[in-house]
Amino acid sequence: MINPKITRRKTLKTFSGVATGSVAGCFTSAVQSEERRSPNDRPRVGVVGNGGIARSHARGLKPLADIVAIADVDRQHLEQYNAEYAAGKAQQFSAYRDLIDAPGIDAIFVCTPDHWHVKIAIDVMRAGKDVYCEKPATLTIDEGRTLCRVIKETGRVLQVGTQQRSSPKFQTAVALAHSQRLGKMKRVTVAIGSGPKGPAFDTSSPPSNLNWNMWQGQTPSVDYIAQRCHGNFRWWYE
């Protein structure tokens, strides 16, 4: 039986508190019931950045919300994402600010490269919308303080995409450890992955479908290198 007391706002609060690698992994039964509710009661979501992690989230969002607007500086990503995850019905924007200003959006996913996270999240909250922001939410301590201040000023919800920590399996493992069901903890092992290695890469002109200047945003401008763009941006430093 569908719970008539579940509103879009309540769904958004639940939605902001649960997230796995594909978001859907830890939906509650109440949230799952949203799939059977009227389309008018489903949250309307905008997605900024339409690369790999946004695709993962889109699969999890399907039973919970409707993707109604998308933005990306790569036209190819924009069109593919719309066709695959929004049935070609989402509004498309090349500038994220236009998506933020679009009416009828309840929450916005920020799935861009790291250096854009804080700027976009702040703009979204100041526009009166809630945010799901991929990790890392910030790159510096000062950015974190600024983000916290804006959250308090606006009263908006900001959920950071620490999907593993939110998953039921991970939370069960933590509970087992805390209760000593696994025995006394004697050692903690932490592994930090490393990126790929390679020689110096050649620069080239950016493809016509990519706004390279906007991709770089507020970072120092550098020549385009195909191997350092999109999903590979974290592995290389000057």
Report each predicted region and the residues it spans:
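N-terminal secretory signal peptides and thylakoid transit peptides that target proteins
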Residues: 2-19
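N-terminal Rossmann-like dinucleotide-binding module
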Residues: 15-86, 167
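Predominantly a Rossmann-like dinucleotide-binding segment in NAD(P)-dependent oxidoreductases
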Residues: 49, 53, 154-159, 164-238
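Pocket-flanking alpha-helical
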Residues: 55-57, 78-80, 97-98, 118-123, ...
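Conserved SAM-binding strand-loop segment of SAM-dependent methyltransferases
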Residues: 90-95
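Alpha-helix C-terminal capping/helix-to-coil transition sites in glycosyltransferase folds
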Residues: 102-104
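N-terminal Rossmann-like NAD(P) cofactor-binding module of classical short-chain dehydrogenase/reductase
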Residues: 108-109
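Beta-strand-loop-alpha-helix segment that lines the small-molecule cofactor/substrate pocket
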Residues: 113-114, 118-166, 180
